[in-house]
Amino acid sequence: MFDIKAIRDDAGAFDAGLAKRGLAPQAARLIEIDERRRAIITSLQELQQRRNDASKQIGQAKAKKDDALAQSLMEEVASIKSAIQEGEEKERAANAEIEAALASIPNIPFDDVPVGPDESANVIRHSHGKAREMNFAPKEHFDLGEALGLMDFEAAAKMSGARFTVLKGQLARLERAIGNFMVDLHTTEFGYEEVAPPLMVRDDAMFGTAQLPKFEDDQFATFKGLARDDQEKYWLIPTAEVPLTNLVRESILSEEELPKRFTAYTACFRAEAGSAGRDTRGMIRQHQFSKVELVSITTPEKSREEHERMLSCAEEVLKRLDLHYRVMTLSTGDMGFASRKTYDIEVWLPGQNAFREISSCSVCGDFQARRMNARYRPKGEKNTRFVHTLNGSGLAVGRALVAVMENYQQADGSITVPTALQPYMGGQEVIAVHG
């Protein structure tokens, strides 16, 4: 969400920012809508002043026992009140129009974000490690999992349809171990506060982080009973970014409280609209998946620094697991709706012979904070400012499981457990067919 005053003050810069995303100019349209709104507000204020003046005159007329004038003024006040009610309705409609228009526009990229139409314009920032040498043809995770008898897509399809997985035995334990390892790392070494948030949220929470209204088709909604009453409607969270960021919704924090850093290990739910035909086998693109999320709330002066810190925290997970990865700076055409700059971490999957995204770390500026009305009061100042919000995967747990399986597979189909995860597996070193 944007400040319409800032758009009025520098319409050219606003449109130039949108142009980097390949979008047409919007400032003139927004300013026109706002001018209509401001004219309605001015007219309403004039009516309210007329009503107040006439009301005073009624008292004066009655004091002079001028009943005819008092009656005339009361009729005028009644007429003005009717006009005020109509004006208030117009004001509500005008406010809704400008808010809807502003809410439909994505965030403005930072100047150092590469400009391009899509992922082809993404830039490799750096890479870490090397791909493991294997003297056999590596398998993909779903072939490994099914051969172990610990990954059951058929059973999942019978009960839930496509894009679901049943994990069993030691693979289920390994996934849990990965998530617990991540949370422990982020809380004990990096200072994140663990949160166990709701997995169902209302419209306002989804609007606050900008999943709504633009990405409604990508979400799962649920209702109480069969009523389908919007008053009883909830959204299954597509990411713990939603509840974690909304922890500061409609709050005024002190500067001393910042930064706030939250982490959560949750299930996430996505409809994957528009993903037909992509990654139909395996765990890469699921309707339900587990993820460890990182969220930071900070000041405008510190948000760019916090972005780099968040990236390093996410990277450290892969370093501890000794996995080859690279970091991409996303182009303006590939970054998310609410982001001003995004880094993607892509892990190497030998079974696919490709890098695949396992984390996305974004700095959003005050874009989400304006939608949530999340503010802080700088030290020694009376006025408040909007906080800056950041979010990142730390990491996607299911994809981390895929990466461990494919990178630690052996020629006989067994999986070596990474050293960092062995304490979470009761010391187990290998997952084999009878493991």
From Swiss-Prot:
Binding locations of ATP: 270-272, 357-360
Residue positions binding L-serine: 239-241, 293, 393
Record keywords, A-Z: Aminoacyl-tRNA synthetase, ATP-binding, Cytoplasm, Ligase, Nucleotide-binding, Protein biosynthesis
GO annotation, cellular component aspect: cytoplasm
GO MF annotation, one: ATP binding
Broad class of the protein's primary localization: cytoplasm
EC number, as in UniProt: 6.1.1.11
Example GO biological process: selenocysteine biosynthetic process
Compartment annotation: Cytoplasm
Disulfide bonds: none
Pfam families: Seryl_tRNA_N (PF02403), tRNA-synt_2b (PF00587)
Pathway: Aminoacyl-tRNA biosynthesis; selenocysteinyl-tRNA(Sec) biosynthesis; L-seryl-tRNA(Sec) from L-serine and tRNA(Sec): step 1/1
UniProt function note: Catalyzes the attachment of serine to tRNA(Ser). Is also able to aminoacylate tRNA(Sec) with serine, to form the misacylated tRNA L-seryl-tRNA(Sec), which will be further converted into selenocysteinyl-tRNA(Sec).
Assigned protein family: Belongs to the class-II aminoacyl-tRNA synthetase family. Type-1 seryl-tRNA synthetase subfamily.
NCBIfam families according to UniProt: serS
Domain topic, free-text comment: Consists of two distinct domains, a catalytic core and a N-terminal extension that is involved in tRNA binding.
Protein name: Serine--tRNA ligase
Gene of this entry: serS
